[in-house]
Every structure is written in C-alpha cells, then in structure tokens.
C-alpha cells in the first residue's frame, strides 16, 4: 500500500488566495496617497464698526439748523485821555456791524455768554490818568455811576465777564439789548490813550 503525500504550494493551493489578498491590499495602500489641499491666502476680514446707540451724545456744539455759536471781535480806536462812551450789547451794538446787522438778524433769540474787555495802551510814558468802566447788566444806566474799576492809561489791562454777570444765562429776543458797559477817562483831551478791544461769545437759536 502506497501513501501519497500532498505538499502545499506557497504560490498556489490553499495559501495562494491569502497571499493575493495581502498583495492587493498593499497595492491599494500604495496607490492611495495623501492629498494636500493648498488654499490661496484669503483677504483680511473687514471689521464692522459698532454703531452705538448714543452717537448723538458725542457731537458737541449746537445741532445744525437749530442754533449757532459765534465769536466776534471789534475795536474802539483813537481814545483820548478824557474819553467817555458805552457799549450796548445787542441790536444797538453799532461798533460791531457783523453782529448787529449780520447774524443777529437771522435768529429770533440770542444770549451773549462772555465778554472780554481789553484796553490797549498807546499813551506816552509822560501821560497820566485812567479810564473807569462799569457794567450795567440790565441797560438801566446811561452814564458812568461808579469809578471803582479802572484802566491806567499808561498800562492797559483786561476784564472778563461771564454769563451770570452780564445777564447772559437766559435767552433774549433779538430785538432787545442784553447789557451795557460804560467808561469815562479823567486824563487830558490832548493825550492819546489807546483803544478798546472787545471779544464776545454769542449763542443763537430759533433761526428766522
């Protein structure tokens, strides 16, 4: 009796399908390659501005179309030692046409909130005397009544009046004067004294 021994073939037989599967898996693994995605550099994102609910509160000054705030400067020249006169602030301020005949006629109401009165001396060192001045906040006085406040003719000086001192807290009708400053010198008529330089700040409302 003869015995037949069947040896398995590595490249065939039972083990051959397993080898083929492994080889096919390796081939697939080799075929699959990682894909690298290259993206173009994007544009920077625009940041949206936050719109606050109180944007109006950041605005300063008087809203357009409702009012205005202006500053006027005028001078009174060629004053002598015994000069006297007055500034009536309002529609009677003839020394400042830009205010009297200009912007004041464009509004129904106004108030002067600040007055700077400066005396610029042009007197010689040999001159003597002074110029007294007085504030009348209600335009009731027509001539100088007090000699307490003075400018020395040879030195000059300045005086600032705020709103509460010049009746400038409340609004005034554009046809009414607000206040007055009077002055009078005690020097000689032959002596040159100098000039006044006046700066006023005006608020206006209710345009015509």
Swiss-Prot record:
Its main location: virion. It comes from the Viruses. GO terms for molecular function: structural molecule activity. Keywords: Capsid protein, T=3 icosahedral capsid protein, Virion. Residues 1-17 have a biased composition (Low complexity). It is found in: Virion. InterPro entries: Luteo_coat, Viral_coat. GO terms for cellular component: T=3 icosahedral viral capsid. Residues 18-30, 44-61 have a biased composition (Basic residues). Residues 1-68 are annotated as: Disordered. Major capsid protein that self-assembles to form an icosahedral capsid with a T=3 symmetry, about 23 nm in diameter, and consisting of 180 capsid proteins monomers. Most of the 180 monomers are the major capsid protein, but a small percentage contain the minor capsid protein, which has a long C-terminal extension. The N-terminus like those of many plant virus capsid proteins is highly basic. These regions may be involved in protein-RNA interaction. Belongs to the luteoviruses capsid protein family. This is Major capsid protein. It comes from Potato leafroll virus (strain Potato/Scotland/strain 1/1984).
């Amino acid at each position: 009796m003869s015995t037949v021994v069947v040896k398995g073939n590595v490249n065939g037989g039972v083990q051959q399908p397993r080898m083929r599967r492994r080889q096919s898996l390796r081939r697939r693994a080799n075929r699959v390659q990682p894909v690298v995605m290259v993206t173009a550099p994007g544009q920077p994102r625009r940041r949206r501005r936050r719109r606050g609910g109180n944007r109006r509160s950041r605005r300063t000054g008087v809203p357009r179309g409702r009012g205005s705030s202006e500053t006027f400067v005028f001078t009174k020249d060629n004053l002598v030692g015994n000069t006297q006169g007055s500034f009536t602030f309002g529609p009677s301020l003839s020394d400042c046409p830009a205010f009297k005949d200009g912007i004041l006629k464009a509004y129904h109401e106004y108030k002067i909130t600040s007055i700077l009165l400066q005396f610029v001396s042009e007197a010689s060192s040999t001159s003597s005397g002074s110029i007294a001045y007085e504030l009348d906040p209600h335009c009731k006085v027509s001539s100088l009544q007090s000699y307490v406040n003075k400018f020395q003719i040879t030195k000059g000086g300045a005086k600032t009046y705020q709103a509460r001192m010049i009746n400038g807290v409340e609004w005034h009708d554009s046809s009414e004067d607000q206040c007055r400053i009077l002055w009078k010198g005690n020097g000689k008529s032959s002596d040159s004294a100098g000039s006044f330089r006046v700066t006023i700040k005006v608020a206006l409302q209710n345009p015509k």
